[in-house]
Amino acid sequence: MAHRGEAGQAPENTRLALTRCIEDYLEWEEVDVRLTKDGKHVLAHDAVLRSGTNAELTIAEHTLEELKQVDLGSNFAARFAGERMLSLAECFALAKGNLNLYLDCKAVNPEQLAREIIDAGMEKQVVVYDQLERLRRCHEVAPGKVALMAKWRPDVGPPSWAPSNHLVAVEIDADSITPEICRAFHALGIKVETKNLGDWDRPAYWDKSVAAGADWIQTDLPEEVMAHALWQRIKLRPVRFSLHRGANRYAPENTLPAFEKAIRLGADFVEFDVRTTSDGKFYLLHDSRLDGKTDGHGLISETPSSIIAGLSAGVKFGRSYAKVGLPTLDEFLNAVAGKVDLYFDAKAIAPEALTAALKRHGVVERTVVYGSPGFLAKIKAQDPRIRLLPPLGSPDELEVLARDLKPYAVDTDWNILSRELIARCHALNIKVFSDALGKHERVEDYLQAMDWGIDLIQTDHPLRLMRAIELSTTRKDPTSAGAE
């Protein structure tokens, strides 16, 4: 259950935060609900709204129309400028059929809220969390039709307290959950959600909640919870995966936070791009220009490292990453060596420098290098242990690549993938990698490629690929994935 949406990647409680949950195939999101001066329910955690110009508006003292004028995005990042407050009606329209909602009622009209849920046809997708007095008012308007949930602690009474107050679920702090508590509530037909925020939002407490039998985990790290749980259930993966420029969906691409996130998500490989500055230093950057992903300007090849070192590589992603810079190749290798395999996209670096860096950090045998056949031939001459990954744009190119380069794998255009081509590659002792970037980032596409025998999928959407991995594993052995 994502707390205020994917609030680490988009402004909390906004359309963008909800949309990201839907795109990641998350099942539940927690949102906060308040009432405006003109009686409209809106999504907001704090009672006071702060705009990109630092203006402050008390939600209960302003109309929805007035609040809709406030820019909620600029404080997060300039790319979100113009993001507006979401009404509950708009939230329901977006979530219907796509995302279940935990409504954390900060200041609502209970009777009106119950009617709005029913009128929107959201009874089966919503649970309302509030104090008991307001929950009773919801129940009086729609007895048995709207799911109700409240906080439970041992001092409020035995588990029978929940059904006696018309609740269908309870929230319990993650440090208090036990198997005995869960079993007692489940015996009464009551679901259990654990609040795993703050210091409790880490693997030890996630495991504690799962082991206790919790039905939901509320978290600010839904992507990590999902990955952590999946890899405990699935030990033998049907395919390996690489995260493109690191976990670029959750942190700025080609930065240390993106690669650290990728490792926590269980990536087999991280892909990264290397370019050279005007004074011969090596930095991670995809584009030839600095303008796209940093606050710098111009070509990196015409910029000295003294300038590069002072740039922000994160401010355009989100202001919380404003102090994150472009890592040097050595900084990157120091951070990840031995933790994950490396997919080295040699954008602009001499073969000799590339080989020397891999040797210096002891990662020669954990690296594949992507580049043109001519460039890779030079790498092979430097050190034949380095695994080579040339592009394969046409099946007709395969035999020549196999004969002249003897690559470890080929980076195959997704559009030419087939069972027959993959079998041909395997017969030549060549693995098949492919980028599912863009239009092929779909569960059905991943599943087809896995069925054909692909060895590695590169993705920008790890949770989508994980969904496909779980489906593939379950179809082959319904008992192998286990129960959540």
How should each PLM-predicted stretch be described?
Residues 1-484:
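Phosphate-group recognition and catalysis centered on beta-loop-alpha active-site segments
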